[in-house]
């Protein structure tokens, strides 16, 4: 299969990128190195080419009412210019994908979805929304999407943005500005646990933006650092930490369900039943107590008996400890629970800890 490339591919090569296949795309996994990229985002600023992600424009008279049926979060409380992280639910209460919905007014909205699930999401949304008179436009290939992340993100980005004061954008707010003569969609969102922005703009201006930020000393970062940053921040990766068979309650995303604010939505009854009965498993944080790094699909044991599976794991550059996410039965999910992780036939001690593993200091 031929891998797709983003419009910034040649610029990534020039910046020294090493590439790997990811969800049908040839993506930069690192530039100068995972640790230095990770550190740049935690202490200063780094940028990620995330143009591979799915981007859908939604329009229609009853847009909010139609979307309300597909997600457990109350989108009706959003004002234009605000955004909501939420999940698309299937008929069984499982998570089709985690997405960000950007409210642009009563008749307009925008969705950014995961690259691996772009077609699945499109099929689900068109099936449910077109009958409600909603028009969907897939603009995934039309624009670049660049994430500028870190404590110095605002300072780095503002010089190339006109007609928008980034300081006025609160977390999970978005607006329009001008970047190199093109209208740009700019949101104060991210996937690193740090302050930052995600910028969508036409490729010509996007290439100029990349080059301008490189010239300003912003470090290009790859998927490797993106993964360690999000894991330290306790953020989920769809397809590993949750999937079609995982409910928001199991995944620790119950806070996305606005029970009292919403009428019917897909699988509400199923989720209410699960909430009343209690979940049987829960996504927890693990910290290794010595050597060994827990990786995806490694077994978690209690008293020598396998009770769960690791979904994501890495060596944390910030904490200098091995950390992981894992699903464990409720009785073994409390903070302080001692477990072991089987790594290449040997058991290594670990402990259930509070999530997130890292929290950025507030501005």
UniProtKB/Swiss-Prot annotation:
* Any matching Pfam family: GCV_T
Name the keywords, alphabetized.
Aminotransferase, Transferase
Q: What is its EC number?
A: 2.1.2.10
Record-annotated membrane-spanning stretches: none
Annotated GO MF terms: aminomethyltransferase activity; transaminase activity
**Reactions this protein catalyses:** N(6)-[(R)-S(8)-aminomethyldihydrolipoyl]-L-lysyl-[protein] + (6S)-5,6,7,8-tetrahydrofolate = N(6)-[(R)-dihydrolipoyl]-L-lysyl-[protein] + (6R)-5,10-methylene-5,6,7,8-tetrahydrofolate + NH4(+)
Q: What InterPro entries has UniProt attached to this entry?
A: GCS_T, GCS_T_bac, GCST_C, GCV_T_N, GcvT/YgfZ/DmdA, GcvT/YgfZ_C, TrmE/GcvT_dom1
GO BP terms: glycine decarboxylation via glycine cleavage system
Q: Which GO terms describe its cellular component?
A: cytosol; glycine cleavage complex
Tree of life domain: Bacteria
Describe its function.
Answer: The glycine cleavage system catalyzes the degradation of glycine.
State the similarity comment.
Belongs to the GcvT family.
Q: How does it assemble?
A: The glycine cleavage system is composed of four proteins: P, T, L and H.
Q: Which protein are we looking at? A: Aminomethyltransferase
Q: Which organism is it from?
A: Picosynechococcus sp. (strain ATCC 27264 / PCC 7002 / PR-6) (Agmenellum quadruplicatum)
């Amino acid at each position: 299969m031929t891998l797709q490339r983003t419009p910034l591919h040649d610029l990534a090569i020039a910046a020294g990128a090493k590439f790997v296949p990811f969800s049908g795309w040839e993506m930069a996994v690192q530039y100068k190195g995972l640790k230095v990229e990770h550190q740049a985002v935690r202490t200063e600023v780094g940028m990620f080419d995330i143009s591979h992600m799915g981007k859908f424009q939604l329009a229609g008279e009853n847009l909010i009412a139609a979307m309300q049926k597909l997600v457990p979060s109350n989108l009706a409380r959003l004002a234009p210019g605000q955004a909501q992280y939420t999940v698309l639910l299937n008929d069984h209460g499982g998570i089709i994908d985690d997405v960000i919905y950007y409210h642009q007014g009563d008749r307009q909205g925008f969705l950014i979805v995961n690259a691996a699930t772009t077609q699945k999401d499109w099929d689900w949304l068109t099936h449910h929304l077109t009958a409600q008179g909603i028009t969907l436009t897939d603009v995934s290939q039309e624009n670049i999407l660049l994430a500028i992340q870190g404590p110095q993100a605002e300072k780095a980005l503002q010089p190339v943005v006109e007609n928008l004061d980034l300081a006025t954008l609160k977390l999970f707010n978005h607006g329009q500005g001008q970047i190199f003569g093109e209208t740009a969609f700019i949101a104060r969102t991210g996937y690193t646990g740090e302050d930052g922005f995600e910028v969508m703009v036409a490729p010509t201006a996007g290439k100029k933006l990349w080059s301008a930020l490189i010239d300003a000393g912003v470090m290009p970062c790859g998927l490797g650092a993106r993964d360690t940053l999000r894991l330290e921040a306790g953020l989920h990766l769809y397809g590993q930490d949750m999937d079609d068979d995982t409910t928001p309650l199991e995944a620790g995303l119950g806070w996305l369900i606005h029970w009292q604010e919403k009428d019917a939505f897909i699988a509400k009854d199923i989720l209410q039943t699960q909430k009343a009965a209690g979940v049987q498993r829960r996504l927890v944080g693990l910290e290794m107590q010595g050597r060994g790094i827990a990786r995806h699909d490694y077994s978690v044991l209690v008293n020598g008996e396998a009770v769960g599976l690791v979904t994501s794991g890495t060596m944390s550059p910030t904490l200098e400890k091995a950390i992981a996410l894992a699903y464990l039965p409720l009785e073994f999910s409390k903070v302080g629970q001692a477990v072991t992780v089987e790594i290449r036939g040997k058991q290594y001690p670990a402990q259930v800890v509070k999530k997130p593993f890292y929290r950025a200091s507030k501005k």
